[in-house]
């Protein structure tokens, strides 16, 4: 059994080296005693909410008002019957305000929280299968439910405690989860939750019966691990929002067409071809145009003979591993890019963007000879080859010429691949008959 909280929270006694007497503890610059001494006394009625406020207004519960008191909601770690309900209003008045424990168990700072480590409720308050015991712990843990952590801050909450304890699930976006201050152990009291949260905990931690005192170490590790991951994600989001809000490098270069803001003129220059449609960097092998020289250099690898990355399913080889990863989506049937208008899915993001232009109905690139319009400028560039009879890509089987290598491959796949496969089937049937 753990020691009483008064023993745990007693100040450390230092012995004098010469006299052997207990030396007075060294006063810290930011000790709890000094913090509490500099603040005003809390108002009477520590758990009284402001009843006269309008709906939606914030109700302040005065539990040690000078110190942000963070009390997470923690589910029972025991085998709980789903039908075992508890009158949490009565539990709140009896256990937290110390009517059962006596005045000696109350906090020395008059915050109204029962600091007694071991206390029992009457049988009328504790149904069978429930163990009502607040756990004093030195770390703030949150009950994980569907990837979320639920906290309850008595200082910055607009919810009355009985409403919360009667089973109201509060998302982290509704609750102000303030950073922990250096508090004594009793300010981190865990309140036992109702059967709804207990059922969620049972699903997440499917363990058999275990002692009625504390959580298993594996469960604490699991909760702390998820709590750390949530903190990291929150920090990354906060950093991203801070950068977008102008706290970082100022973004002063704005695109006059779409209003997008950039932090350097070079980035704005690279962005402008998106609106002008200019693709000045053209591949000499296939004629495909690019907005940036770096993209052209990366594209040139396609035309080399070396293809070290092979697909394990079909044996097709690729120049780059990223192209292989995109190709694997075809075998898996994975189309992550879905059109918002028609629901059509695509394996590649580029094809998805090109498809979305068909829904806009805007074809700003027109041919000066036949007035045929296109969504993208490189389609117009390839279309111009039809007027000057320039078809650099020729089919080796039938001799038909094409303006793009893509059209040549599509032609071979639709016509000649079927013919070759049918011929091979005929040869196999002839050998079988002979």
Swiss-Prot record:
Species lineage: Eukaryota, Metazoa, Chordata, Craniata, Vertebrata
PROSITE patterns, per database record: ZINC_FINGER_C2H2_1, ZINC_FINGER_C2H2_2
Signal peptide: none
Top-level lineage group: Eukaryota
Native source species: Xenopus laevis
Any Pfam family the entry gives: zf-C2H2
Chain ranges for the short sequence motif Engrailed homology 1 repressor as given in the UniProt record: 27-42
Function: Transcription repressor. Component of the regulatory cascade that controls the development of dopaminergic (DA) and serotonergic (5HT) neurons.
Protein name per UniProt: Fez family zinc finger protein 2
């Amino acid at each position: 059994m753990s020691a009483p909280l008064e023993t745990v929270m007693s100040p450390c006694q230092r012995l004098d080296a010469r006299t052997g007497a207990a030396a007075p503890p060294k006063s810290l610059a930011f000790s709890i005693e000094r913090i509490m001494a500099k603040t005003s006394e809390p108002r009477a009625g520590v758990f009284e909410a402001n009843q006269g406020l309008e709906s939606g207004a914030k109700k302040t519960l005065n539990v040690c008002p000078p110190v942000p008191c963070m009390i997470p909601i923690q589910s029972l770690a025991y085998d709980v019957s789903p039908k075992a309900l508890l009158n949490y209003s009565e539990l709140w008045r009896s256990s937290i305000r110390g009517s059962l424990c006596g005045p000696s168990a109350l906090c020395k700072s008059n915050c109204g929280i029962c600091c007694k480590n071991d206390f029992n409720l009457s049988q009328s308050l504790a149904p069978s299968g429930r163990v009502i015991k607040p756990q004093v712990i030195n770390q703030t843990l949150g009950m994980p439910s569907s990837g979320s952590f639920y906290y309850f801050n008595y200082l910055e909450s607009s919810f009355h405690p009985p409403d919360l304890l009667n089973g109201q699930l509060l998302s982290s976006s509704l609750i102000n989860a303030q950073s922990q201050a250096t508090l004594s152990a009793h300010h981190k009291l865990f309140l036992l939750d109702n059967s709804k949260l207990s059922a969620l905990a049972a699903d997440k931690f499917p363990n058999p019966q275990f002692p009625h005192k504390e959580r298993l170490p594996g469960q604490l590790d699991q909760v702390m691990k998820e709590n750390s991951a949530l903190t990291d994600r929150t920090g990354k989001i906060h950093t991203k929002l801070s950068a977008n809000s102008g706290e970082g490098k100022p973004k002063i270069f704005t695109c006059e067409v779409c209003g997008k803001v950039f932090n350097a003129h070079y980035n704005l220059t690279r962005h402008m071809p998106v609106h002008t449609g200019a693709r000045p960097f053209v591949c000499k092998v296939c004629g495909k145009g690019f907005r940036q020289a770096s993209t052209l250099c990366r594209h040139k690898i396609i035309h080399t003979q070396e293809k070290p990355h092979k697909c394990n399913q079909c044996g097709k080889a690729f120049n780059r591993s990223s192209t292989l990863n995109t190709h694997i989506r075809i075998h898996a049937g994975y189309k992550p890019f879905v059109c918002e208008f028609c629901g059509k899915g695509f394996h590649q993001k580029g094809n998805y963007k090109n498809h979305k232009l068909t829904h806009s109905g805007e074809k700003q690139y027109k041919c000066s000879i036949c007035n045929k319009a296109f969504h993208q400028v490189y389609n117009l560039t390839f279309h111009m080859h039809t007027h000057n009879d320039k078809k650099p890509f020729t089919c080796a089987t039938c001799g038909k010429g094409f303006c793009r290598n893509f059209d040549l491959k599509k032609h071979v796949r639709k016509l000649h691949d079927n013919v070759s496969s049918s011929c091979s089937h005929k040869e196999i049937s002839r050998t079988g008959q002979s």
